[in-house]
C-alpha cells in the first residue's frame, strides 16, 4: 500500500480542461513546459515493471485444497492440453455423504443400488477402519441390508482381526457361512456366545477348527437349540476338528442339530470312537466317511458381499498396528549375548492339512441320501432289524438312573447357562 501511495505522485494526470464563459480552455497551456505536456502521455501503469502477482489458495489444510478441486474431473486431450469438466451433482452428493457416513440416522427403505455405491465410496475413503465412526457406519448398513453387506465371512487364522474388530464382526447379520478356524477363541470368548443370537440363526456352515474348545464350550453353544429351539438350528455343516479337549460327552450335545449333514471331529479327545460313531448314526443319521470330504477342504468358504474388501483393510491395519508396537530386535540381541533361549516370534499357522493324520484317521461324517421308496424288500427288512436294535439301545439308555442324570443336567447346567444370557 505504501508503494502505491508513493507511485501516485509520479503519475501523469494528462490534460486538464476548464469551461469558462462558455469557452473550453486547457489549463496545461498556461503552465510552464507546455511543449512537454503536449507530448504523447506515458501509458498508465498500476504496477511497475517486474511486479508479479501470485494467486494464493488456502494452504492451511490438504483437505480444504482437495475440496476446491474435488468438483472437477481433469483429463488430457490428444494434443496434450489439460481439460477439466464439472462432476455430476449425484457424484458430489455421494462424496459428501460418504465423508460423513457415520452421521446417517438410518438407511432402511433406501434403494439397494444407491446404497451399494455409497458403501463403495465410503470404503474407498477407508471410513470403516476409523475407530468408533466405522462401527456406527457399518451398523447402519447391516441393519438395513443384512446379507447384502456380507453373506459369507472367512476369518481363518485372522486372530488379530478378531481381537481388534470384535464389535464390527458382531454387527454382521444374516450370515450363511462363517469360518473361525485357528482364531484361539476358547470357551469363554464373546464371539462364541454371539453365535447363539438370533442375528446368526441363518448360519448353515460353521468352521471352529483349532479354537481350544472343550465340552463346556460345546454345551454353551448348543444350549439355546437344545432347550428353546433357537440359535444355530439351521446348521448343516460343523467343523470341530483339532480341539483335543472335546470328549465323548461333548459330542452328545451335538445331537440337537437335527439338520446337520456334515460333521468333522478329527483330532478331538474321543475315547470310544466306535460308540461315538454308533450314537451319531442312531441320533442324527450321520455316517462315517472312509474318504476325506470335500466340504472340509476350506475352499468353499470365502468372504463374499459388499464388505469383502473391508475385512482385508482391517487385517492390514491390525498387522501394521502390531508391527509398530513390537520392537523386539534389541531384546533378541541381548538374549543371544547372554546365551539365553531366544523367543521365536513367528506367525501361527493353521493346521489345515495334518501330515500325521491319514484319511483313515479322520473322523468326518455325512448324511446318507434318502433311499428310493421302491427299494427291495430285503433292504426294508434289514432296516426294520436296525430299528429294533436302535429301540433296544434306547431302552437300555432310558434307565431310571440315566433319566435322572438327564433331568439333573438340564435343570442345573443348562438353565443356569441360559439365565446368564
Curated annotation (Swiss-Prot):
SUPFAM superfamilies: RNI-like (SSF52047)
Name of the protein described by the UniProt record: Leucine-rich repeat-containing protein 42
Keyword hit for Repeat: yes
Annotated InterPro entries: Leu-rich_rpt, LRR_dom_sf, LRRC42
Record's keyword terms, sorted: Leucine-rich repeat, Phosphoprotein, Repeat
Region (Disordered): 376-406
Ranges for the LRR repeats: 149-170, 174-195, 202-222, 234-255, 259-280
Domain of life: Eukaryota
Record gene name: Lrrc42
Cystine residue pairs: none
Similarity annotation: Belongs to the LRRC42 family.
Modified residues (Phosphoserine): 399
Record field: compositional bias (Low complexity): 396-406
Amino acid at each position: 500500500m505504501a508503494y502505491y501511495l508513493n507511485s501516485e505522485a509520479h503519475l501523469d494526470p494528462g490534460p486538464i480542461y476548464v469551461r469558462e464563459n462558455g469557452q473550453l480552455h486547457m489549463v496545461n497551456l498556461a503552465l510552464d513546459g507546455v511543449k512537454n505536456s503536449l507530448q504523447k502521455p506515458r501509458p498508465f501503469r498500476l504496477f511497475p515493471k517486474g511486479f508479479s502477482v501470485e494467486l494464493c489458495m488456502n494452504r492451511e489444510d490438504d483437505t480444504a485444497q482437495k475440496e476446491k478441486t474435488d468438483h472437477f474431473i481433469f483429463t488430457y486431450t490428444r494434443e496434450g492440453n489439460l481439460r477439466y469438466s464439472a462432476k455430476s451433482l449425484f457424484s458430489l452428493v455421494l462424496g459428501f455423504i460418504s465423508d460423513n457416513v457415520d452421521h446417517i440416522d438410518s438407511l432402511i427403505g433406501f434403494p439397494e443400488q444407491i446404497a451399494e455405491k455409497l458403501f463403495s465410496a465410503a470404503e474407498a475413503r477407508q471410513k470403516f477402519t476409523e475407530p468408533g465412526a466405522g462401527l456406527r457406519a457399518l451398523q447402519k448398513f447391516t441393519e438395513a441390508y443384512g446379507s447384502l453387506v456380507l453373506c459369507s465371512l472367512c476369518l481363518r487364522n485372522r486372530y488379530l482381526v478378531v481381537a481388534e474388530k470384535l464389535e464390527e464382526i458382531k454387527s454382521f447379520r444374516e450370515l450363511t457361512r462363517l469360518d473361525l478356524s485357528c482364531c484361539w477363541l476358547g470357551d469363554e470368548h464373546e464371539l462364541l456366545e454371539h453365535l447363539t443370537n438370533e442375528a446368526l440363526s441363518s448360519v448353515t456352515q460353521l468352521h471352529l477348527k483349532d479354537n481350544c474348545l472343550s465340552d463346556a464350550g460345546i454345551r454353551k453353544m448348543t444350549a439355546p437349540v437344545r432347550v428353546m429351539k433357537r440359535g444355530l438350528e439351521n446348521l448343516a455343516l460343523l467343523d470341530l476338528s483339532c480341539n483335543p479337549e472335546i470328549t465323548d460327552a461333548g459330542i452328545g450335545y451335538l445331537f440337537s442339530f437335527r439338520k446337520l449333514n456334515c460333521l468333522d471331529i478329527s483330532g478331538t479327545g474321543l475315547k470310544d470312537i466306535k460308540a461315538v460313531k454308533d450314537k451319531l448314526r442312531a441320533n442324527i443319521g450321520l455316517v462315517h466317511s472312509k474318504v476325506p470330504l470335500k466340504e472340509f477342504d476350506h475352499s468353499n468358504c470365502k468372504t463374499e458381499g459388499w464388505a469383502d474388501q473391508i475385512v482385508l483393510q482391517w487385517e492390514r491395519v491390525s498387522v501394521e498396528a502390531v508391527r509398530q508396537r513390537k520392537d523386539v530386535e534389541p531384546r533378541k540381541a541381548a538374549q543371544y549375548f547372554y546365551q539365553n533361549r531366544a523367543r521365536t516370534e513367528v506367525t501361527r499357522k493353521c493346521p489345515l492339512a495334518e501330515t500325521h493324520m491319514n484319511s483313515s484317521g479322520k473322523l468326518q461324517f455325512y448324511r446318507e441320501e434318502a433311499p428310493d421308496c421302491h427299494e427291495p424288500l430285503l433292504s426294508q427288512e434289514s432296516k426294520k432289524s436296525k430299528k429294533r436294535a436302535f429301540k433296544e439301545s434306547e431302552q437300555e439308555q432310558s434307565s431310571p438312573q440315566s433319566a435322572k442324570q438327564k433331568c439333573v443336567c438340564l435343570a442345573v447346567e443348562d438353565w443356569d447357562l441360559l439365565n446368564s444370557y
